[in-house]
Amino acid sequence: MSCSKGLSQSLKEDRISQLPDPLLTQILNLLPTEEAVKTSVLSTRWRTLWLWVPNLELSFSKFPCFNAFLSFGNLFFDSDRASCVESLKLYLDGNDASYLKPWVDALVKRKIQRLYVRRTLGGYSHVMPLSLYVCDSLVSLRLYRLSLVDAEFVSLPCLKILRLKDIVFHNETTFERLVSSCPVLEELKIDVVWNDGNVYKVHSRSLKRFCFRSSSLRFDESVPGVVVDAPLLCCLIIDDSVSESFVVTDLESNAKFDISLCFRLWRFDEAKRSIINMFLAWISRVRDMKICAHTFKLIHRYSESSPLPRFGYMSSLYVTLNASELEWFPIFLRSSPNLKSLILERSGSSHQLSRKAMERVSMSSVPECLLTSLEFVEFKAPICGLGPEMMLVWYFLKNSPTLKKLTLPLKSHSTKDDFFKKLLEIPRCSTECEIVIL
């Protein structure tokens, strides 16, 4: 009786083992890789189940030595295994990487969909094998600190997301061919942290989102530039302090841009003026734009000798300003007649705002957008209620009959009562404007 009871209890406790292998594999797939592998000691039934898990994260740092890492990988990346691999995150060290070719070859054969490979130690000698260039199942590819060789033939028919950081390209053609051979590519992100001398040419009929970041530790270093030809592009993020030029030849009229460019601002000659002229021409078609302080200063310098284009499409603007640029800001707004939403970020202390400069702003002619379209204004930097700051608040409340909401963050709650008194003294042009104090 007691034996029968014990057997019954044992069966109840091990009901999970009675589930079919495909269902057990799905359960293991919910666990971190190292936890899934631990189940191999439960019984003979469980010994190899983890090998069929479709999602894996493999890092050399989880193993006592390189040989243990290599043995584990060779066991999983068996090209004869019939199961598909949906996704893999692979973290490499600086050891010899000859194992990469058979591993990646096996992944391509097993229909990998999402691949992330990152080298965390060593230089850039780890070269991705040629089989990766012809993977017909790959949907997402993210590579970090690796080398890509030139391939005569590239075919990635399903790739939608491509992210490359600190990648060494054999030449400019390697990158250009890679991007242009992805017919359904929608998102591209590139991070460059040294001067590789390449012109990055992006030609894509399907690309919708593009992020490019480039920087250098050397003040005098520059790179040739970037050329983008992507007619469906609707979101562009640029954080580039080293490129001599950045050209976008085609884009959606409703595009959203986040721009941090300086074009080596300290060398402002005729050639640079021509580049900036082209830059302004293509951003004039943007609907939603975010501009950093360096880029705004660049536009200001250009306007001192050449007229600005009309930013007729722009309805939303997020701009960071130095105190010295604030006086010129209304002039920029005159080129944005249909602006509806404005977010102002201040670079530097509020004490740098000049009362005389703000007086000149308040006495300048009112831009068309303030009179006909501006509905939302938000100050991002906390304000103290100082004279020059209040003059800027006065400028929007006094001159915009269409304003619906003004958002002001206070630096100190102790000034709130005094700040309210100052606000009540400002005449409002709009009868519907709501003032929100944060």
Curated annotation (Swiss-Prot):
UniProt cross-references to Pfam families, sorted A to Z: F-box, FBD, LRR_At5g56370
LRR repeat segments: 135-166, 167-192, 235-261, 318-346
Protein keywords: Leucine-rich repeat, Repeat
Domain FBD: from-to ranges: 362-409
Residue ranges annotated for the F-box domain, each copy included: 13-59
Protein name per UniProt: Putative F-box/FBD/LRR-repeat protein At2g05300
